[in-house]
Swiss-Prot record:
Envelope protein part of the entry-fusion complex responsible for the virus membrane fusion with host cell membrane during virus entry. Also plays a role in cell-cell fusion (syncytium formation). The gene is OPG143. Part of a stable entry-fusion complex (EFC) which is at least composed of proteins OPG143, OPG147, OPG155, OPG086, OPG094, OPG107, OPG104, and OPG099. Formation of the viral membrane is necessary for the assembly of the complex. Interacts with OPG094. Interacts with OPG153. Residues 364-377 are intravirion. This is Virion membrane protein OPG143. It is a single-pass type II membrane protein. Most cysteines are linked by disulfide bonds. They are created by the viral disulfide bond formation pathway, a poxvirus-specific redox pathway that operates on the cytoplasmic side of the MV membranes. It comes from Vaccinia virus (strain Western Reserve) (VACV). The chain crosses the membrane at residues 343-363. GO terms for molecular function: ATP binding; DNA binding; helicase activity; hydrolase activity.
Amino acid sequence: MGAAVTLNRIKIAPGIADIRDKYMELGFNYPEYNRAVKFAEESYTYYYETSPGEIKPKFCLIDGMSIDHCSSFIVPEFAKQYVLIHGEPCSSFKFRPGSLIYYQNEVTPEYIKDLKHATDYIASGQRCHFIKKDYLLGDSDSVAKCCSKTNTKHCPKIFNNNYKTEHCDDFMTGFCRNDPGNPNCLEWLRAKRKPAMSTYSDICSKHMDARYCSEFIRIIRPDYFTFGDTALYVFCNDHKGNRNCWCANYPKSNSGDKYLGPRVCWLHECTDESRDRKWLYYNQDVQRTRCKYVGCTINVNSLALKNSQAELTSNCTRTTSAVGDVHPGEPVVKDKIKLPTWLGAAITLVVISVIFYFISIYSRPKIKTNDINVRRR
């Protein structure tokens, strides 16, 4: 019988590429059993991601060890942004707890499990694994950078999601009061968050003639029209002399409305100059889409009266324009001009050429010829 396989030598050798990597050289009485087991002992403090959205220190957390060992490898700034999850299974030397044995070549989990007395020296565990999470920013400067999109590189998703959640509402309320025409403020408004609509309602109640208020009215109608109506009412109540307000706040007289219909259909300030819908209340805006008004100009060079009667004829009915406005909130789409295609032009050219060819043939004068008598013998 042959002698039993015995371990004669253990030697720890450093790695070359990474100082955390080491080799445990196992020498047996039979050289064919010699092995070099690669493992790692973590010594870094991480201030960067090992891969997008995650940090994986080279540390195997075995039973009985506190999870604080894992968190000790990341800087405090990252500790707020990442959470520890169940990592992949790993193996560690008990006499060097936390070491991470690499599975490679012949060294596999099955190989370690089959080794006699392996559990006396090798323990199983889970590798430390952190993933990035959404987190609340603690300082106002970071909130300002993320919500104003000055620098979004390290912003959590809840502060960088195109204003879909409430996390930027407080900052944007103050920011947009100072710069309501800012593109980011208009993007916040387009998300139709109620704090945004309320903020712009208050702003436009003082500055309805500003350009961004036209966008404000377009966005809120028809679902949230009360924000716009409130702003228009307050502005026109404070600026009664503003001609733009004459349609919304017309002097209280029912005679015109009684005989001519709703004033949005015939009043000059409603039908001609006030084309911007922000100067109309929403119900007026809807009413104007139903108006059947036609505008025209009549020029009279001479007028003859006979028996106190006069007849005038105008061209109003010849207009081809659409009657009334489009419904509020629906964009006006202009029909594209249809240009002739090259194929159609080529076919037309060929047909014309053929026609001219036959015309030229049949228009030529006849050639005079002599009759030839032929007699068969």
